[in-house]
Amino acid sequence: MVVLKGVPALLSPELLFALARMGHGDEIVLADVNFPSSSICRGGPEEIRADGLGIPQLLEAVLQLLPLDTYVQSPAMVMELVPSDRKSGLLTPVWTSYQSILSRAGYEFSLGMGRFAFYERAKKAFAVVATGETALYGNLILKKGVLAPKDLC
């Protein structure tokens, strides 16, 4: 836990350090409990543990500090349902939460990345945050944007 003015207390020092080191276009994965975080991070992105935290609450905290990329169509991406889950009508209410949180922060939200494409993209991410999110298809990739000089302290 971090106890600093203006910094959400649920953001760990490791996560804050990763967010600070990311550059424009770098991506971070907020991963649910079923995501193969350790496997994806073997030889690739940094793995950051955030066990016990849900992705919606973590997303709200991260967006207080991390600007998302406004130069791309969607700086936030989820994994599409696999055909069998789509056919069975599996619901993904967590996506509605993401959409609401991102919209309040002024960002667009995109669906449309297949499972294996998502895994390959995650391997190229700056970091993967392994959370306690239990919602199916809860994984979310965020692309860092830029801060204008007037927004820098």
From Swiss-Prot:
The keyword Ribosomal protein does not apply. Its EC number is 5.1.3.29. Transmembrane segments: none annotated. Keywords: Isomerase. GO terms for molecular function: fucose binding; L-fucose mutarotase activity; racemase and epimerase activity, acting on carbohydrates and derivatives. It comes from the Eukaryota. The keyword Thylakoid does not apply. The active site is at H24 (proton donor), D69, Y119. It catalyses: alpha-L-fucose = beta-L-fucose. Pathway: Carbohydrate metabolism; L-fucose metabolism. Substrate binds at D32, M79, Y119, Y137, N139. InterPro entries: RbsD-like_sf, RbsD/FucU_mutarotase, RbsD_FucU. GO terms for biological process: fucose metabolic process; fucosylation. Belongs to the RbsD / FucU family. Involved in the interconversion between alpha- and beta-L-fucoses. L-Fucose (6-deoxy-L-galactose) exists as alpha-L-fucose (29.5%) and beta-L-fucose (70.5%), the beta-form is metabolized through the salvage pathway. GDP-L-fucose formed either by the de novo or salvage pathways is transported into the endoplasmic reticulum, where it serves as a substrate for N- and O-glycosylations by fucosyltransferases. Fucosylated structures expressed on cell surfaces or secreted in biological fluids are believed to play a critical role in cell-cell adhesion and recognition processes. Mainly homodimer, but also exists as homotetramer, homooctamer, and homodecamer. The homodimeric form seems catalytically inactive. This is Fucose mutarotase. The lineage of its organism: Eukaryota, Metazoa, Chordata, Craniata, Vertebrata.
